[in-house]
Structures are given as structure tokens and as C-alpha cells.
């Protein structure tokens, strides 16, 4: 409905151009918002106040002109002027009911789909040769929820898991594997459970032994030169590490696959050309033997130019180099209209610099959008970054195990007579969903406190509350299996019916905002408000015990669309629903 009002206003602006009220080349930025007070209508715009200067008229006079020139619409019951020139729109109840009936019979819930784009989404991207830890959670699940919503809206989404599968740490790991095999023979194999221990032991050897460090550096050079032996060992590390990553993805319900992996090593052959092209464009400078690019817009607090280091004095490449190669690939080969990067907020300056440089060097098309969607940190209840009791990094699998165990205790306490298999399955869904939703429901850019007690609560904006809300709505239909809804129509008579209907109609605009801002918490907030609106409706408006069959059918349709919307919304967040809790 919001997009319909925007369309009416766009047509009105065109009419103003034809009448000479505004210049023919005038570009209006039309903004329509939901009203907080329903006595002021359902939707409102400040367009009249925005046009005051260009039209040379006072806002209330312009507001009346806008109303007089609005195309006729059966969706609008009335339009009023308020205050200094706000225009309030009251939506027709019958039009709203028709919109919801259409949503019930459409896989896209009656949402007008945008012009499809090709969108590259870079997310998760852990460093290999280590197990995933809690620091990987936010990028992985925030990115995945945005990906799901973009695909639902009809975009072509290309997932890119830009794993850290290259670099000096691999020389250290290869050297340690050599030592192990020299001592234990070729049968020395890496196991997934050994990966973290292996990495720490290799790092200790690197720090303590000059000879070992020298050998590690030699192996890096050999690996970068395409040495077959080194490449075989490197591939072994990557396979073990990726196997672990995808076990975690499967457990989290994340949609990334092996086919989405396009790590740093994929751009090795392009790095030298990146340097040559920057040099040919006259962008490279030398600083202490390193090849760098200075951009006027980036300076230190003291006013000194801030470089982007492209190649170190020893010939090595950096993250900026591979990021530039990746951006060129995503623009020229993948033909992306938009590229979204879900990386820690602490990398903001890095991305500002490389995005600017990619445009300056024409590595990406001028019209391609590059977006760093940064996020804050997940902290413990002491307000500090989440750690183990000993101060170590928390493995993601350990966090999920703990969530599962706590969820199992919770579900068992509420259902002491439930069979073990059902308890286990419900606990699995509740545990994983609680971890994901606790993160996704927070503003992406904020730090947040991780609390098992809060996330497993059945009160407030939590996964257990929403999962229960869904089962409550879906449960109505287990008692209504014999009711035929073929000829049922939605009729909005009670205030709580209208409030629920209005909230249901906002699903599409919520997804538009969520994908535009890359903010899953917008969808979480919407689903929480929808569950609340249904609860108020259910208390005030008997469904199965309605006064008439027509009223019963109408309310069942509202309940059905609520269940469908909750189910789809949670699915877009990567959260499974349950039919029983």
C-alpha cells in the first residue's frame, strides 16, 4: 500500500510539471511513512513542505493542490491536511482486505518485486587452518539472512565465501607438518579435532626457532611458486578446514556451499597485474621500498597522507591487493550491480580506501555499488569480548553445543512427559534459533551482550517467543481441519482485525528496508510486532467461536496469513519453525 501511495504522488508531480507548478526537470524525493497515531491516518507524507521553495507556495496551499491533483484510487478512503502541511492518507478497509487475500494466494505474498539486480554478497570468510570461533558468527548469519531476503525479492545473488586460504601462516603449518612426518613417518595425518592444537604448536615453533621460521618462509615462497609438494600439503589443510566450516554451516542452517568458496588464493594470478595496472595509471608511489597508493581524501589526524599498501618491500602482497583483484572480478566477470561485504566494523577504513581506489583505478564499473556492512562485537556479560573462562577464543561448535544443552533442559522442564526423540529435535531447533535470533535481532552496527538466559526466554523479542507464537497460530488449524475456506473473504470490522491486517500488509516494505540497509533486525522487529498484533487480535476476536461462519472464515484467513508470514519471515532469517513446542 505504501508503494501505491508513492506511485500516486509521483503521478501528481508529473501533473505539476505539465501545469508549470514545478520545473520540468525537477526530481522529487518522495517519502511516505507509517503514522504512529491512527487518528492521523495510516500513511503520511511531507511532500508539500519539500516543494515549498521550488513551487513558491506555502505548504498548506501546496498540500491542497497535491490532494486536488491526486489520481483517483479505490485504495484510499480519504486524505487530510494536518499541521503545517502534512498529508495524511486513510487506507480503505476493503482495499486492505483485498490486498491480504491476494497475499494468501501468492508465493511472494503479493509483494511488488523490484527490478532484479545481480548482487554479490561476501560473507563468513573465515581464515582456514583454524576452527571457526564466535567471531565468525555475525558475518555468517547476518550475511546469510540478507542473501535469503534478496533472493526472495527476485534478485540474482552470488554468494562469495572469501576464505583466508593463503598467506604466511601456511608456511608455518607446512613446516610443522614436515617435522611431524619426519618424526612419525608419512602416516602422520591431520584430524579435524587436532587443527587448533596443531596451529598453536606450529606458532610456538615459529616463535621459538629461527631455523623453523626460516624453513617456514622458504615453504611460503615454494607454495607461491607452485611447488607440487607444498600445494598438496596446502590442499590437505584447506580440505580439513573447509570440512569443519561446512559442518558448522549445516548445523547453523546457513546456505553456503563448497561452490561458494572463492578465497584469497583464487586471485593469486591476478595480483601482479593489479600492481602493473595501478602503475600504468600513474597511481603508485614508493614508500620505504613498498608500493603504495595515496588518495587525497585519506589522511591521518596529523594531516599526513594515509597509504594503501599494494606490495611490500619484499614483494609480498596484502589484503588490499587481493581485495582489489576480487572487486575487479566481481565487476567485470560476475557483472555485479551491487557488492555487499559483511566484515567487522573495525575494517571500515580499509574498505573506504579500497572502494575508493577501485573506482579511481576503474577496476569496477562506475554504476556498481560497493557496500561495507560492518558489525559490532559479541561481548560476554562482563561487557568484554566473548571468551572462555581461561581467556581463550570460544569455538563456534562449543557455543552451539552449550545452547543445545541449555535448550534441552528448558524444553524438558516444560514437557516432562515428552518422548526423548521429540525433545531432542525441539531442543536442536530452539538452541540454534536462539543463538541466531539473539544476534540478528540486534542492530548490526552495535556491540551486544551475549546471554543464554535472555536468548532462551519465552518473553520479549526472542526466538522461543516467536517459535511459540507460530505454533500457537498454526495450532488453530489443527482444530479447524473440517472448515472449508474456499469461499471465505476477509472483512475488517473490529479494531484489532484492522491492526493485524495493517501489520500484515507491511511485510513487503519491511523486506525492502531490510535488504536496502542490510539490517536483519528490521525483519526481527517486524515479526515480533506481528506476533504481538496477532496475540491482541486473538484475545479480542474469537476465531473458531466467531459469531457467524463468514466472520469465522475471515478470521481464519487472517490467522492463516499470519502463520504464513511468520513462517516465511523466520525462514528468511535462516530459522526453522516447529509445529509443536
Swiss-Prot record:
Q: Provide the catalytic activity annotation.
A: tRNA(Arg) + L-arginine + ATP = L-arginyl-tRNA(Arg) + AMP + diphosphate
Cysteines joined through disulfide linkages: none
Q: Name one GO molecular function term.
A: ATP binding
Q: What is its main location?
A: cytoplasm
In terms of InterPro entries, this protein maps to: aa-tRNA-synth_I_CS (IPR001412), Arg-tRNA-ligase (IPR001278), Arg-tRNA-synth_N (IPR005148), Arg-tRNA-synth_N_sf (IPR036695), ArgRS_core (IPR035684), DALR_anticod-bd (IPR008909), Rossmann-like_a/b/a_fold (IPR014729), tRNAsynth_Ia_anticodon-bd (IPR009080)
- Enzyme class (EC, first level): ligase
- One GO term of the cellular component aspect? cytoplasm
Entry's EC annotation: 6.1.1.19
Highest taxon listed in the record's lineage = Bacteria
- Subunit annotation: Monomer.
NCBIfam families under this entry?
argS
Q: What is this protein's name?
A: Arginine--tRNA ligase
| Organism in which the protein naturally occurs | Shewanella denitrificans (strain OS217 / ATCC BAA-1090 / DSM 15013)
